[in-house]
Amino acid sequence: MGSLPTNNLESISLCSQNPLDPDEFRRQGHMIIDFLADYYKNVEKYPVRSQVEPGYLKKRLPESAPYNPESIETILEDVTNDIIPGLTHWQSPNYFAYFPSSGSIAGFLGEMLSTGFNVVGFNWMSSPAATELESIVMNWLGQMLTLPKSFLFSSDGSSGGGGVLQGTTCEAILCTLTAARDKMLNKIGRENINKLVVYASDQTHCALQKAAQIAGINPKNVRAIKTSKATNFGLSPNSLQSAILADIESGLVPLFLCATVGTTSSTAVDPIGPLCAVAKLYGIWVHIDAAYAGSACICPEFRHFIDGVEDADSFSLNAHKWFFTTLDCCCLWVKDSDSLVKALSTSPEYLKNKATESKQVIDYKDWQIALSRRFRSMKLWLVLRSYGVANLRTFLRSHVKMAKHFQGLIGMDNRFEIVVPRTFAMVCFRLKPTAIFKQKIVDNDYIEDQTNEVNVKLLESVNASGKIYMTHAVVGGVYMIRFAVGATLTEERHVTGAWKVVQEHTDAILGA
């Protein structure tokens, strides 16, 4: 039982080389580096958005895995011919969609080191360097953001706070919501979970809805509080307080507020300080989601957007968005790490060890959902060391400058308007009704619907060209085109060229 047949030596003869042979690793590794270097050199020439149809790859690849080994040369040929056509090129300098996934040499090489070591750092003992480097780089980045010391690790352990690298914002919100949930249920009884209420704005990322669902929050108790143009779609503290008071009146228990610095739709900023002041009156856990815009806050001129963070309970940003660190790398800081650990810890016999029992080390398995974890801190460490604070600020400012340039180009064409104020490096614009309807415009739903339809048509036309790629959002009933600068290879000439593409397609649609 469980033994290999003695008369079948096929598996031994087919692949005599060890899968981790150092010389072969060096040979193939150089080929991959050269392949990717050529890709980055030529990525500008590809259609930015993939032009394939659903199911294209199934028609190109075999129905089953190969029985015999294939060479890396053959595999890379297939990557070129079959995989690259199906990629949307997030590293293209003409990529302006969603939010950036900015890469860098340091981030890529850090990922190589992390993957090469292939350690599983669930606790300190399993790889001390992985744990300790993570706590160090989280303090470094926290200091760059001038986060209060209550969010950082202290040498004497007095602060109670600290940072951890999660995969995504979804995970960060789920972990903090779970900690807040258990902390509250320990006070009011676990049978009252259906009374817990979560608050956010109608602009908050859908990650909160997913986290609440997983954490067992009653879907009816997730409040997406309406925002308006009057506050640039930021969450009003008065609206928050009204919602809280209504829930208390109904016998519900306010639990958690997710405030956002740089919403996905329009980069709106919720007023952290005033919102925290309201939340603290009712014992609500406040999480600050700065997934996109948090990176910019290492620049002094943007730091004010997170003023008031000292009164929050947790704060997160995605280094894989706008901080030149490859996916995935979400940085989460908490003030009360004990609440996080109590909600998420497990201690099976096979993981017990003297280091953990000494209480002198961090076991990051207890700061996240999963047990296993990657050596994410390696790539962030390389990014911080390879570029330094000064250069990272310069990179971020260059993207903001290019967004301002694009905004200026829009301002010179009276057919267009900026829908919401530009705050960081994203511009939200649209064709104006007056450019579409020659007669005098009156405010009515028909005109707005038709304007939205023409803007939909414009964006689809631009993206189908493959020259640039942008995405859209709808705020306050207005369909707008989002132009997000942040790809590492983007230069001002690409921004200028993108505007020319928009104008050309506008001319074609309007018959100019």
Curated annotation (Swiss-Prot):
Changing residue 205 to N: Acquires the capacity to produce 4-hydroxyphenylacetaldehyde from L-tyrosine. This is Tyrosine decarboxylase. The keyword Lipid metabolism does not apply. It comes from Papaver somniferum (Opium poppy). Yeast engineered to express TYDC mutant Y350F together with Pseudomonas putida DDC (PpDDC), Beta vulgaris L-tyrosine hydroxylase (BvTyH) and Papaver somniferum (S)-norcoclaurine synthase (PsNCS) accumulates (S)-norcoclaurine, an important precursor for the production of benzylisoquinoline alkaloids (BIA). Keywords: Decarboxylase, Lyase, Pyridoxal phosphate. Its cofactor is pyridoxal 5'-phosphate. Homodimer. Its EC number is 4.1.1.25.
